[in-house]
């Protein structure tokens, strides 16, 4: 499940909202493209962020002709880019908080 979003939709409702069949959501889960939360009774629950991800997957597959392996790679690249942006933002805020410190001393990898 995507972080920061509360899971509320059972698979039939989620599929209807995303414009696909419930089996499609199961396939996306099997392929590791979505990860819905499961209840104690093993019912899948989808969040709004999960549904947004499904819409992205459907756009890439149906409109752009990308296969599921390609979609998985693109989503991983998107997540990596988001992480890199967070790191860059953190470095920028560190730079602003200590402007007198030389940059080569602040960033040691």
Please describe what each predicted stretch is.
Residues 21-23:
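Short coil turns linking two alpha-helices in DNA-binding domains
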Residues 1-16, 30, 35-41, 48-109:
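Arg/Lys-rich, alpha-helical DNA-contact motif
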């Amino acid at each position: 499940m995507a972080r920061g979003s509360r899971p509320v939709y059972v698979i039939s409702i989620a599929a209807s909202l995303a414009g696909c069949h419930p089996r499609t959501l199961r396939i996306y889960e099997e392929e590791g493209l979505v990860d819905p939360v499961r209840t104690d009774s093993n019912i899948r629950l989808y969040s709004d962020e999960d549904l947004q991800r499904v819409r992205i997957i459907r756009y890439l597959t149906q409109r752009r002709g990308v296969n599921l392996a390609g979609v998985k790679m693109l989503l991983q690249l998107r997540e990596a880019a988001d992480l890199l942006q967070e790191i860059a933002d953190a470095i920028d805020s560190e730079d602003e908080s200590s402007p007198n410190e030389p940059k080569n001393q602040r960033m040691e990898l």
